């Protein structure tokens, strides 16, 4: 992206023995490097029961996350099945690189995919999401996430109790805020609390109610009957 442009890379762990050379080249140009690993928690307080790869992490306070800070909600992210990243040494004074999501110090990882089997195993406070902005390339922006599963219905369905609602909305809101930041729109776009609204019809009396009930039942039956008659005529023609 030499002439500007923005990109989000969601790099879920992949056990295939291959290197993402093109993606790594893009990330390195923005001062970010990627680990070929899969992060997990050693402290049972930081993951759901029997799901050590579903990690409770911290959303860091940056200029990008200021809208989330203002909500007063805990700056906590839920990252399932994630790899980690780390800053790369790049000689570019116009480049700004920040961490977005960082694990607790009790996190560690295992080598997962890639061709560097002798690589040092990352552990401790690991970066699960980072972002960068390069003024020398028309303020081109890049965000990297160690997991794409955070946006799937399957992940939400796999959780129970308080785990299902406490951390996921803030993680998804972080994604929305990043998209808004890249599009130079309002970074206050985020999920609000769900509210149920019930529509109703006011019926003056029982006689009118019975009449409406007959209409509601008979009209669909009549339409279905007409459809069957037309179908039979076409079939026998």
Features from the language model and the residues they span:
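Acidic, S/T/G-rich, low-cysteine, solvent-exposed domains in lumenal/extracellular/periplasmic regions
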Residues: 1-187
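Short, Lys/Arg-enriched, Gly/Pro-containing loop segments at transmembrane-helix junctions
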Residues: 235-237
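Pore-lining and gate-forming transmembrane alpha-helices of multi-pass membrane transport proteins
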Residues: 168, 172, 207, 211-215, ...
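Alpha-helical transmembrane segments
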Residues: 219-233
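Short, aromatic-rich amphipathic segments at membrane interfaces
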Residues: 190-213
């Amino acid at each position: 992206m030499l002439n500007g442009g923005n990109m989000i890379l969601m790099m879920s762990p992949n056990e295939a023995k291959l290197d993402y050379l093109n993606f790594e080249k893009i990330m390195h140009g923005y001062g970010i490097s990627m680990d070929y690993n899969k992060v997990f928690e050693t402290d049972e307080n930081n993951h759901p029961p029997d799901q050590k790869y579903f990690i409770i992490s911290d959303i860091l306070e940056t200029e990008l996350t200021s809208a989330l800070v203002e909500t007063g909600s805990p700056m906590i992210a839920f990252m399932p099945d994630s790899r980690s990243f780390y800053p790369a040494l790049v000689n570019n004074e116009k480049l700004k690189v920040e961490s977005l999501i960082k694990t607790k110090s009790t996190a560690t990882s295992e080598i997962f995919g890639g061709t560097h089997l002798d690589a040092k195993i990352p552990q401790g406070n690991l970066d699960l999401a980072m972002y960068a902005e390069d003024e020398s390339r028309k303020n081109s922006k890049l965000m990297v996430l160690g997991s794409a599963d955070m946006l799937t219905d399957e992940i939400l369905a796999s959780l129970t109790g308080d785990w299902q609602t406490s951390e996921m909305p803030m993680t998804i809101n972080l994604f929305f805020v990043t998209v808004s930041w890249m599009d130079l729109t309002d970074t206050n776009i985020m999920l609000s609390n769900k509210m149920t609204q019930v529509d109703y019809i006011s019926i003056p009396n029982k006689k009118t109610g019975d009449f409406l009930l007959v209409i509601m039942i008979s009209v669909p039956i009549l339409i279905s009957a007409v459809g069957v008659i037309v179908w039979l005529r076409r079939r026998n023609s």
